[in-house]
Amino acid sequence: LILPEYPFVESQIQPASLDLRLGRKAYRLISSFLPELSAISSRLNVLDFYQSDLVMYEMDLTQGAILEKGHVYLVPLLEHLELPATLRARANPKSTTGRLDVFTRVVTDLNAGFDEIRAGYKGPLYLEVVPRSFAIKVRTGDSLNQIRFVRGDATVSDTALQKLHETDPLLFRNASSPKPLPHKEFRTER
């Protein structure tokens, strides 16, 4: 299912997710790129549409490296996936990453999107990283993103959610009052 390049560490395992770790190198890119229906590794050695290399240079993260504000980096992650056909995954930044104003998204081979990993995916994971407010220092093993695994359809209808709230309240007026918020007072539409 998850094939780490280095053994897992206990701190990676969260109640509902797994922290993904930065690999040994990062690529400084000219710009972000939309994943295409090809292997990401093949994009790292070819000319882009403007006939220039997509990769400006490669950085070693094993001793730590500075990622400059406003620049785009692509980092191969230590984890690889071999998902069964019935399991997909979603990735998102850790809350600490957001508080540091670092934009991140997971990229996979043969996928035209970000952060959504299709059922049955087998291959490497990459993280696009863009520090927005200031430079950051990262090293191999640091975690900026997390992954959650999904089987089946995990959505619930508005009606079902309202019925659940009636029998087992989900929202309360405030922390000091155990009185549930009437479902008419909250919106469940997207």
Say what each PLM segment does.
Residues 1-190:
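DUTPase catalytic domain/fold
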